[in-house]
Amino acid sequence: MNQIDRLLTIMQRLRDPENGCPWDKEQTFATIAPYTLEETYEVLDAIAREDFDDLRGELGDLLFQVVFYAQMAQEEGRFDFNDICAAISDKLERRHPHVFADSSAENSSEVLARWEQIKTEERAQKAQHSALDDIPRSLPALMRAQKIQKRCANVGFDWTTLGPVVDKVYEEIDEVMYEARQAVVDQAKLEEEMGDLLFATVNLARHLGTKAEIALQKANEKFERRFREVERIVAARGLEMTGVDLETMEEVWQQVKRQEIDL
C-alpha cells in the first residue's frame, strides 16, 4: 500500500459510522474550514522560517485537510479523492498547452498571459457575469484586493503608468486626514477612507510587482523582531517597558535598527 492509499484508509476509519473517532465523525465542511485556514498559515510560517523539517509535517497536516473534505464529499455522493486529483490534473494540462499540447511559450511572461487568457475563457464557459465572480470572499483582505485589481487589469480597467497610481495614494491620504481633522469625527466615514487608502496602496504594490499580503507579513515580522529586541535591551538595563518614556524607547529602537543594518 502506498502512503496516499494508507492516508485515505486512515481517513475512512476515522469517519467509520460505527468504529470511527467521535470527533472526526461529527465534523462537517463548515467546522473543518477554520482548521484548513490555520494549517495553511502554519505552512506559510514554516516556509518563512525555512524550517523544512517542520514544513514536511505542516504540508502533511494540510494534505489531511484535503483528504478530510474528500471523505466527507464521498460520503455524500458528491466526489472523492480521485475526482479531486483528476480535476487538478485536467486543469494543469489545459492551462499548460505549451507543455501538453502544440502551443508554445518563450518565457514566463507568455506563460502567465496565456494562463490568464485560459482562465478568462473558463469563466466565460461557466456563464459568469463578472470578471470578479469567483474571487473568494474568505481571502485575506490585502490578497483579495490585489486579486480584484488584477482581474480588472486583465480586462483593461487599469492605469498603464505608475504616476496616476502614486497620485491616487496621496489623494487617499488627503481624504483620510480631512476626515480625521473634523471637529466631530465620523468614524464610519473615516473607516471608509482608510479602506480606500489601503486599497490604493495595494494597487501601488501590484504595479511595482510586489504582493501586498507578503510585504505586510514581512513588515509585521520585522517590527516584532525589533520590538522584542527593544524589550530585551530595556530589561537588561533593569527597567520595565511600562516605566520607560517614549523618547528612551525610540532611542533604543533606533539602536536596534542600526544594529540590523550593520549586520
Swiss-Prot record:
Keyword annotations: ATP-binding, Hydrolase, Magnesium, Metal-binding, Nucleotide-binding
Catalytically driven reaction(s): ATP + H2O = AMP + diphosphate + H(+)
Effect of mutating K222A: Loss of pyrophosphohydrolysis activity against both ATP and dTTP
One annotated GO molecular function: nucleoside triphosphate diphosphatase activity
Pfam families for the chain: MazG
Quaternary organization: Homodimer. Interacts with Era.
Protein name as it appears in the record: Nucleoside triphosphate pyrophosphohydrolase
Organism of provenance: Escherichia coli (strain K12)
Name of the coding gene: mazG
